[in-house]
Amino acid sequence: MQFKEVKAKSVEELHKLVNDLKAELWTLEFRNSTGSLEQTHKIPQLRKDIARALTALKQKEMETK
């Protein structure tokens, strides 16, 4: 996910995106711990996507203040 795509979303969409990504990360980490996850490279990608979304969210919140 590119930062441009994330930055274009509204605050509500960013909150939903962060929650969805965190839920997906939890699922992948659980599957990884049980040994059933084959694509382990997705975990760091999701962490970076969450960081991008949180950064964009913080920027939007700072703009409105």
Curated annotation (Swiss-Prot):
One of its GO terms (cellular component) is cytosolic large ribosomal subunit. GO terms for molecular function: structural constituent of ribosome. The keyword RNA-binding does not apply. The keyword Ribonucleoprotein applies. Keywords: Ribonucleoprotein, Ribosomal protein. InterPro entries: Ribosomal_protein_uL29 (IPR050063), Ribosomal_uL29 (IPR001854), Ribosomal_uL29_sf (IPR036049). It comes from the Bacteria. PANTHER family: 60S RIBOSOMAL PROTEIN L35/50S RIBOSOMAL PROTEIN L29 (PTHR10916), LARGE RIBOSOMAL SUBUNIT PROTEIN UL29C (PTHR10916:SF0). NCBIfam families: L29. HAMAP family: Ribosomal_uL29. Belongs to the universal ribosomal protein uL29 family. This is Large ribosomal subunit protein uL29. It comes from Mycoplasmopsis synoviae (strain 53).
